């Protein structure tokens, strides 16, 4: 309760009038615009009892709707608390899925650190080995970067082979892969001195752009190598039930 930042006041979701308005607005939005999926920002900061009400209202009206919450926390037990899980605890979340930061940090460690008891590729193994706590880990959203963190191509030192290996992990892992725009050509950027450096325009979207990265001719050889790798794996994933719904071994 309070202000998330000085520019972002919280809404009092425990107030019945506010809660009803938010639920009605969510239902209206799906109906009006034909939305088939919700990414719920900063899920952990919400009133979780209210979120269960809102989630249920949306699922009751739209059974095929997909919903997942941003849960920027550390550790699989903490992350799984905010989604449907197998814990025998008082609060039970009914949220379908979460943004899987634990898998992201596992891939990051695997690509940037030597093997150790708790670091390197072992961190990825340890995260995935705890999938049994989720009701359905296949619904979690897996990713390499987003608008709040460093672009992954920069994280791996702009090493094309490491980047392609990371993409291979992403597109052959359990869960629903999410790509942040620009990742398909290896856009770079860190969040320092501010987040604007990972939110640059994709070249070619504006008339004043000197190059058009939407076309093969506008991309460099390295960018096309990354593009082709993603396209090949993504098309394979679309046609492979073993990858999309198979058991994680």
Regions found by a protein language model. Give the residues of each.
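Surface beta-strand/loop "capping" patches
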Residues: 243-249
């Amino acid at each position: 309760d309070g202000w998330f930042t000085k520019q972002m006041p919280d809404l009092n979701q425990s107030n019945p009038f506010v809660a009803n308005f938010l639920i009605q607005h969510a239902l209206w939005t799906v109906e009006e615009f034909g939305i088939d999926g919700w990414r719920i920002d900063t899920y952990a900061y919400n009133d979780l009892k209210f979120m269960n009400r809102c989630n249920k209202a949306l699922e009751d009206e739209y059974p095929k709707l997909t919903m997942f919450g941003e849960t920027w926390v550390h550790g699989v037990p903490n992350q799984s608390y905010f989604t449907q899980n197998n814990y025998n605890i008082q609060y039970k979340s009914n949220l379908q899925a979460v943004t899987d930061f634990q898998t992201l940090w596992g891939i990051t460690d695997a690509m940037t650190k030597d093997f150790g008891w708790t670091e390197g590729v072992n961190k990825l193994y340890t995260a995935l080995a705890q999938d049994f706590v989720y009701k359905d880990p296949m619904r979690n959203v897996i990713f390499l970067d987003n608008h709040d963190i460093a672009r992954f191509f920069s994280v791996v030192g702009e090493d094309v082979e490491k980047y392609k290996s990371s993409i291979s992990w992403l597109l052959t892992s359990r869960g629903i892969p999410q790509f942040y725009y620009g990742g398909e050509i290896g856009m770079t950027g860190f969040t320092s001195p501010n987040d604007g450096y990972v939110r640059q325009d994709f070249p070619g979207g504006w008339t004043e752009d000197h190059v058009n990265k939407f076309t093969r001719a506008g991309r460099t050889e390295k960018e096309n190598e990354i593009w082709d790798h993603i396209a090949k794996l993504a098309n394979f994933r679309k046609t492979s039930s073993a990858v999309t719904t198979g058991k994680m071994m």
